[in-house]
Amino acid sequence: MEVEKKIRGLREELQQHNYNYYVLDKPQISDYEFDIKLKELQELEEKYPEFEDDNSPTRRVGGAVTKNFETVVHENRMYSLSNSYSKEELEEWEARLKKIVEGKIQYVCELKYDGASISLTYENGILKRAVTRGDGFQGDDVTNNIKTIRSVPLKLKDEFPHKFDIRGEIVLPYEGFAKMNAERVEMGEEPYANPRNTASGSLKLQDSAEVARRPLECLLYSITGENTGVASQFEGLEKARKWGFKVPAESELKDSIEEVLHYINYWDEHRHDLPYETDGVVVKVNNFHQQEELGHTAKSPRWAIAYKFKAEQESTKLNKITYQVGRTGAITPVANLDAVQLAGTVVRRASLHNADQIEKLDVREGDTVFVEKGGEIIPKIVGVDFTKRDPDSNPTQYATNCPECDSELIRKDGEAQHYCPNVNGCPPQIIGRIQHYISRKAMDIEGLGGETVALLVNADLIESYADLYKLQKEEVLPLERMAEKSAENLINGIERSKEIPFERVLFALGIRYVGETVAKKLAKHFKSIEALMAASEEELVNIDEIGERIAWSVVEFFNIEANRENVERLKEYGIQLEISAEKLANQTNILEGNTFVISGVFEKVSRNDLKKMIEDNGGKLSSSISSKTNYLVAGDNMGPSKLAKAEKLGTSIISEEDFLKMLE
């Protein structure tokens, strides 16, 4: 009975982890830990077949299907893969293959990208449907969202089968992920946890326009269907490339397991050179006839196996949980650790994200914790070694008061973060807002850095960004590391900031969710701070690309008396709080409805001036050519890839002079 109890317990635990991973997109353990538990259950079920259960996690591919989209049954089931973690396990797999098939076996090695699996159906060269993996038997129809991903061809090239499915992975490159998080932090939002969950969550967004704004990519790796004219896995990859799919160039054909192991070892060392997150290598029998002979188990194909890289994870002691306050008042718990080497860096601190995460992991001070570093900005704690826990330890009580000003924290319905409401009295919020105000993309005050701002606040010389404009040289001279010349530079830099245009001043105010792009849009629409302050949520929502959240935040900001007072003071000090008459005279809607891409070096005007001209005259700017691009403004030494793509898509290619004539 003890064995039956153990089996039942493992099944329940794995089913819960499946639910967390596939339904909630909130895994509580690493893939490696999950696979170890699954393997333990498989071995027990094989040893004690009397406890067999058709609903065991060992017989299923994954979790339940999300119900937000239409559920679609896969014509060809999407199996999961068996996992391996050692050379010996790969050699055992090969031995099993050779017992079933005769003749030489070739292998295709493919990097295992960590994203969201997708199945695309094409008929007569046209994308008809895109379905998530779901539970392997059925998934969610996310066609509209997938169509926004530019690496997914809507119409194929060359000669292709009448109908087929092609499987792939939706991934978020590190660079794009970092950019998304930088924008979120800039707007006072919590950064996304990692590329995989962000990619997966993107597919389930209701608004396809939001998906289009995310730099997702689709990497394809497997053709399936009848009468495809493809005889092997590697041939399928080559044909898919010809048809217009993005197929990773790192995939290689190998003649032996020894060559496969060389491939695995190479990429285990070089995976951080790739633009995407990878967690292993998939090894497949190349020949489709041999694949057919080998067949499938109830859970996975016998002809393929995944070799999982060991997670870059270490255990260390959590000494103390402290709390940081951001410029918007958001509270972030931080784990202070014994120093540990991880992914080439020394880690002493790790994110705990929020109160829910602490409760979910049951993290306590004094615990030995597992720290992991993947695509995250900073390392994170993924688990606790409960075998090493002090029996007298107490559960973590999340902070109830601000660590800086002792104000009672608040937590709004539906939000993960706690906030300090003491907007105008909490030092980190004051310092953070002023540091944002002086930053390069905002007021760009020369001679004034983040450390100096902290010194000024701590010396009670300033309490808001408006206070900067009343500073005198004599007041700042006594500050640490402040000499006569640097004090002069600081005061002069503050004075010059009075020339910064309205849209940058609006961004500098630090309104939550109002980044550079939104600030430009609001400035252009309202033309003055008075008009913006008088706007209602309804009026704001009617502006293109301004949603309810931004509208609420803008109105809320100007409802606060201290913010209105700061704006009045800025006006008195001569800050640009409206679009200048000269700029208004230069603005038109001549280019409205047109999207431009700029490439190369120009003679008469700089690239920045060109961009400004486009925006001032109602046009839109893009960094890359797409079917929505109307004009490519071509200068000397322009990128050949942009030129080729523009020619291919039939985009109008114009010179600097052609563009300037459009404004006449």
Curated annotation (Swiss-Prot):
GO terms for cellular component: cytosol. Zn(2+) binds at residues 402, 405, 420, 426. The keyword Cell membrane does not apply. The gene is ligA. Its cofactor is Mg(2+); Mn(2+). The lineage of its organism: Bacteria, Pseudomonadati, Bacteroidota, Flavobacteriia, Flavobacteriales. NAD(+) binds at residues 31-35, 80-81, 110, 133, 169, 284, 308. It is an enzyme of class 6 (ligase). This is DNA ligase. GO terms for biological process: DNA repair; DNA replication. Pfam families: BRCT, DNA_ligase_aden, DNA_ligase_OB, DNA_ligase_ZBD, HHH_2, Nlig-Ia. DNA ligase that catalyzes the formation of phosphodiester linkages between 5'-phosphoryl and 3'-hydroxyl groups in double-stranded DNA using NAD as a coenzyme and as the energy source for the reaction. It is essential for DNA replication and repair of damaged DNA. Its EC number is 6.5.1.2. GO terms for molecular function: DNA binding; DNA ligase (NAD+) activity; metal ion binding.
